[in-house]
Amino acid sequence: MSETETMNVNGPQDFYSDSPFCLEASFSSSDLLQNETKNVKRGNESVHMSSEDILSTEGSLLGDINLGNYPERIQNQPANTRVSSSRQFEPICKFHWIDAFNDDSSVPDLTRAFSYSEEKPELQSQVYNDPADASQKPDPLKEESLMESSTSENKDELVHEPVRKSRSLCLNHYRGKTRPLTETPLVRSVVVDVALNNNQPESFLGKENVCRNGENLSDSENCFDQLDLRAIYKAGKPEVSSKGIQNSGEFSDMSVGPQEEVTEDGLDSLAITSPWSPAGIFKGRRSQDDFQMPDGELDFESLEPLEEDMALNEALQKLKQTNKKQELQIQDLHGRNLTLESRVQELQTKVSKQHVLLDIINKLKVNVEELIDDKYNVILEKNDINKKLQDLQETSANTKKHLQESKKDQESLQLQVKKIKVHYVRLQERYIAEIQQKNRSVTQCLEIEKTLSKKDEELQRLQRHKGELEKATSSALDLLKREKEIREQEFLSFQEEFQRREKENLKERRKLKSRVEKLVAQVKSLLFTCESERAQTTALQQQVDALRLENLELRQQAAKREAQACTPSFEIIQPKEKLEEVVEPDVTQDTKGTHCNLFLNCSSCKENPELPSMKRTSPLTSRLHSLLALTIGLLTCQDLAIPDTELRQESKKANDIMLQRLKDCQLRKKDLDKELLKHRNRIATLKELIANEKALQDHTMEITDFDTEEVKNASEAPVLLTVKLDKYHSLNEELDFLITKLGDLLESKEDHYSRLIEENDKYRRHVGSLINKVTSYEEIIKCADQRLEISHSQIAHLEERNRHLEDLIRMPREKARGLRPRLDNHPKSMTLISHLEGHHKECSISM
């Protein structure tokens, strides 16, 4: 197919692309020669305007009011994508009206119907064009001005164009070397062959007109062959009548007649269309060919109505008037028509194919009817698709709203995520700080545990030492208890003996007092008697002296009287015995006084040291009780904490010193006991002396022989006892002081242990609180991580939803774009509608 033929197919398609015939033709040819059509369109924009003018004028020539005014109504009406109910079936009525009009016509009528069926869907397609295409169409006034300018320009170009260029263009136009075998070029070739078969004997003017038409078709971009064929058919009817009128004319008249017809037809066409339109060209060509056609061939065209003959006669008269003006043009075109004779001979070979082409035309008519049915189905499908597109637009609007809402939600979620991230960073910082604190606390706890383990070891050691000390103290306490019991028993025995002795001494004192009083009275009486006796003794001495003198005298006389009398010797012995009796009570009284004084001093010495001993034994018992209480406290405080090593060393030293002092005290007590035993012997001797005092009263001579050393020892014994008792009390005081020190140390240790226990409890509580805080922060961080994961999942879900909604918005557009090629390739299939319905259901479900 040549470039002009591709433009003939594709040119109307730019304006009327919804007809099924044009759709099939366009998609079959545009895929092959898309680049060529673009180049031709760029170079020949002016020819498009002339082709549009031709379309507007040819509609008025047909005489169809509805079809002729249809493009104007489409241009005036706004573009609407929806198809109304009354307008859906408008092409049906038009086409059936055309079929009714063409039922009685011959083979050229079929070509005319075919050309009409090609043109009218192109006109119908303007309903479905976009508003931009409708807005780009020029106004009728502008079109007329452009038509006039284009006619003048085309005339000048055709007059001054060289013959060589016209020949090449005509040959290229009619040979059709590059024509592909598609449906639309096949129909066009059939129509051209029919027209050529009716125009076999061509005249000189016909050749020139054909050449001129070839030049115009080759120069223009959109050669509307369908309109040309229809114009040829219209031009054939008046030419028959003109041929019948001028059969008797001369050759000069025949040569001039076609020229006049051509000029008259040209003038007639100037009133309606441009002079260089394809309809005018083919009219002139048809009129010139009919003058040279034989009578056998004109019988097929003699059936035209008489009304058209009258119109043609009027047109012929007008053409005769204008024929003189066109003689000069005919002379110029004479050379060009010579080149067309060779082409006419080639075209005569195609006449044999007419009967084949008639069958093809019938088949094409059937195919056209099927295509019309398919077109109606496509229109219905398109209406459904438009409805579904509206639904999809509504769904897309809803999806846009949902997208906006989701974007708002996403923005809010992003803000929340940012806040959560800030909180998460803060929590991480807190967590890091708390982990550091936890590590510090853990290190502190480890150090504390180490110190506690060391202290536990030290406590165990101290407990061991404590056990040893307790054993030692228990043994010492047992010994002390035993000694205490022994001492208490001894003390009780001493107290009993002392009480007995005191009682005895009191009795004795009373007796002695009574005796002393008696003795004092006796002494006083004796002193009185002594004085009296001294006086008597003096007297007696005097008497004794006298008596001695007398005795001497008597001895002298006795000697003299020995023999005489024995009585005077017995009287001398009696006064001697009286004197001895008087001397003895004086001596006994002196000895008794000295002995009483000694025993009184001893008793006083005994009473005086024993009273403070009683007073001192009471604090000893109290201190022993305090020691027992402290030992009980030590036993109760075994589980308490242990002091430091220095305190333990000091306590060990103090315990050692105390043990040594206790041992020294025990030794001293033993020494004192021994000394007491010795003094007991002396006391026993003193008791024996006291017991013997009674016996000594009767034996004064024996008392005079009493040892002076023993008396000195007896007088020194209470002093020694007091000294030893003082030493014993001092030792007891030292023991009490050491016991108080031990109690103070134990109390200090108890306080220290209690403090350590409290500190350990505090540390344990602090560690427990830290562990609880760490666990709580870990839980908080876990919750924050979970919230972040949830927010990330929500964001991902929203992103997926947005993508899905964007895909849903894109899908109707893509399917609307791909809908036309699918409908063109498969016009009868309804699978796309079902697919769209299913997709619409999916969209509604997803929304």
From Swiss-Prot:
Pfam family, one: CAGE1
InterPro entries referenced in this protein's UniProt entry, alphabetically: CAGE1_homolog, CAGE1_N
Domain of life: Eukaryota
Leader sequence residues: none
Coiled-coil positions: 377-567
Organism: Rattus norvegicus
Region (Disordered): 118-161
TM region positions: none
Key words of the record: Coiled coil
Name the UniProt record assigns to this protein: Cancer-associated gene 1 protein homolog
